[in-house]
């Protein structure tokens, strides 16, 4: 066991010296000296053992055959392992450098060789991961002559052999064998290095989107009756279609509820096999042929179109609504709804639906069903040429522009017939500006101060504009200072505030004037308020007792 440990330590020491030599830290002479000292020291330790163990070791050593020897002997010990009959070098031993990240490299050399006879150096590189541009460099022994190599290469001027492997996959091995011939006795140091670039591979799946569009619609329709088209879009390709957009111009003679002339639908991305359906509804305004064209486009692809032609027939039902263009808030307004059948067919199950805007209250609608802001009349039949008229009385609680929408739906041999109409009324509010004047201290002593506070409030439902305030005081009171939402000016016993541009509904502002009592008496303060709503200025008087 001691013998095995000794030889393992010796091999490790010699290998370390070889590594230092390959890295350039040691010169040739120094490396040879260190190697010789290591081997001599190992022999000296062996001789210090007991004579019995020494004799037994020598006896075992003389009887040991080269083939059965398992431990690695020092490089200079030619008797450690005998060569084969046709070779002049010993058994190969391996030195491994493990680079867990990229490439693992091992180098195998004989335990000993004979001067003048070639011996091999075997280098094996194993890929730890996929690498490219793998470069293996072999430093030739200094006192040896290059014979050949497999793969073949030519030594450089500084005695190096270089091989390049374009790609070495994970788990793949590449073996190199170099034959050199030692020129003199001693230790032949050799070293191999490897340099590799890790390779990262990525895959991009390429496909081709193919957007197809089809459209469905009626062959015939009635004037002023809804015409519905279904646009079907499907991606029949193998890749995602990006930024899919469908454009549908409103055909000539049609109207859309949005008021737009081109309808645009942004579908975003569509996966392969994905299907989308868009429904568009138009109201025909004139008879004749109308063609609806839908065009689909997507990023990097060609535009595709689909069209349907519809023949618009005579109208079946008509509706109109009339009412005031404007009115004051809380004042009732009457709308008149007229429904007629100008066609040749009997209309059945006629439904007249009047929908009012939020904020509008229905006061009266004879013969109708009222539900919140919706009024509905029903008629079993409406003969050709017949007309009906309905009235609805409403009132708005707040100012604003409100639209009254009427839709008539009916059935006929021409199919479902619908007509719609609307009327818009602007409901105006009324401003109601009021003023209140109080003094904070009453009575006051001569030389003391009192404050007049003037509160101006708009109690109405509309804003008031250009609100102006002026205050006049008797000789017993002298204005000292003022405050308010606008600037003011003191002239003698009069204070004038600049006009307030607007006073909103239910809004209150406050003005104040600080006055000094200069003489005893029953003083008076008059506030005069004017605005665009107040055609005649409003005045309010407050008295203050001074003693």
Swiss-Prot record:
Subcellular location: Periplasm
Residue span(s) of the pro-peptide: 23-40
The UniProt record lists the keyword Disulfide bond: yes
Location, primary (coarse class): periplasm
GO terms of molecular function: extracellular matrix structural constituent
Keyword annotations from UniProtKB, A to Z: Cell shape, Disulfide bond, Periplasm, Signal
Segments for region (Disordered): 45-84
InterPro entries: Chlam_OMP6, Chlamydia_OmcB, DUF11_rpt, Ig-like_fold, OmcB-like_DUF11
Coiled-coil regions listed: none
Signal peptide: 1-22
Any GO BP annotation: regulation of cell shape
Residue ranges, compositional bias (Basic residues): 52-61
One CC-aspect GO term: periplasmic space
Comp. bias intervals (Basic and acidic residues): 62-79
One Pfam match: DUF11
Cited function: In elementary bodies (EBs, the infectious stage, which is able to survive outside the host cell) provides the structural integrity of the outer envelope through disulfide cross-links with the small cysteine-rich protein and the major outer membrane protein. It has been described in publications as the Sarkosyl-insoluble COMC (Chlamydia outer membrane complex), and serves as the functional equivalent of peptidoglycan.
Alphabetical list of PANTHER family matching this protein: LARGE CYSTEINE-RICH PERIPLASMIC PROTEIN OMCB (PTHR34819:SF4)
Assembly and interaction partners: Part of a disulfide cross-linked outer membrane complex (COMC) composed of the major outer membrane porin (MOMP), the small cysteine-rich protein (OmcA) and the large cysteine-rich periplasmic protein (OmcB).
Protein name: Large cysteine-rich periplasmic protein OmcB
Organism: Chlamydia trachomatis serovar D (strain ATCC VR-885 / DSM 19411 / UW-3/Cx)
């Amino acid at each position: 066991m001691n013998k095995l440990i000794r030889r393992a330590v010796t091999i490790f020491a010699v290998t370390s010296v070889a590594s230092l030599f390959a890295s350039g830290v040691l010169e040739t002479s120094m490396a040879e000296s260190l190697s010789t000292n290591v081997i001599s020291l190992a022999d000296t330790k062996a001789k210090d053992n007991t004579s019995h163990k020494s004799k037994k070791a020598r006896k075992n050593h003389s009887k040991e055959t080269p083939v059965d020897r398992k431990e690695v002997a020092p490089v200079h010990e030619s008797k450690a392992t005998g060569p084969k009959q046709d070779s002049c070098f010993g058994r190969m031993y391996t030195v491994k450098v493990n680079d867990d990240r990229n490439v693992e490299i091992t180098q195998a050399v004989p335990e000993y060789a004979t001067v003048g006879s070639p011996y091999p150096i075997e280098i094996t590189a194993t890929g730890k991961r996929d690498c490219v541009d793998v470069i293996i460099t072999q430093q030739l022994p200094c006192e040896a002559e290059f014979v050949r190599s497999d793969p073949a290469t030519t030594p450089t001027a500084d005695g190096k052999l270089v091989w390049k492997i374009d790609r070495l996959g994970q788990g793949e091995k590449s073996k190199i064998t170099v034959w050199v011939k030692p020129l003199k006795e001693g230790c032949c140091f050799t070293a191999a290095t490897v340099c590799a670039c890790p390779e990262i591979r990525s895959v991009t799946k390429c496909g081709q989107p193919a957007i197809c569009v089809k459209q469905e619609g009626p062959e015939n329709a009635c004037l002023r009756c809804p015409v519905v088209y279904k646009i079907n879009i499907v991606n029949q390709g193998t890749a995602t279609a990006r930024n899919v957009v469908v454009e549908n111009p409103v055909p000539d003679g049609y109207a859309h509820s949005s008021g737009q002339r081109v309808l645009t639908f942004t579908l975003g991305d569509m996966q392969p096999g994905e299907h989308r359906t868009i429904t568009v509804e138009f109201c025909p305004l004139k008879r004749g042929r109308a063609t609806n064209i839908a065009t689909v486009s997507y990023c990097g692809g060609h535009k595709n179109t689909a069209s349907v032609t519809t023949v618009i027939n005579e109208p079946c039902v008509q509706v109109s609504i009339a009412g005031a263009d404007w009115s004051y808030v809380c004042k009732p307004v009457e709308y008149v709804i007229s429904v007629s059948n100008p066609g040749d067919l009997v209309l059945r199950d006629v439904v007249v639906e009047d929908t009012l805007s939020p904020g509008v209250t229905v006061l009266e609608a004879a013969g109708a069903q009222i539900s919140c802001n919706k009024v509905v009349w029903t008629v079993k039949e409406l003969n050709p040429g017949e007309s009906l008229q309905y009235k609805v009385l409403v009132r708005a609680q707040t100012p604003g522009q409100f639209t009254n929408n009427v839709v008539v739906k009916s059935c006929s041999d021409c199919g479902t017939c619908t007509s719609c109409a609307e009327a818009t009324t602007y409901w105006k509010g009324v401003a109601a500006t009021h003023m209140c004047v109080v003094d904070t201290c009453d009575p006051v002593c001569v030389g003391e101060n009192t404050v007049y506070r003037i509160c101006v409030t708009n109690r109405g439902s509309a804003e008031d504009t250009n609100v102006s305030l002026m205050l006049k005081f008797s000789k017993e009171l002298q204005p000292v200072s003022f405050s308010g939402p606008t600037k003011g000016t003191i002239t003698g016993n009069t204070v004038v505030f600049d006009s307030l541009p607007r006073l909103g509904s239910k809004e209150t502002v406050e003005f104040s004037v600080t006055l000094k009592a200069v003489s005893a008496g029953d003083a008076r303060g008059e506030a005069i308020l004017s605005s665009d709503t107040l055609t005649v200025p409003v005045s309010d008087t407050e008295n203050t007792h001074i003693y």
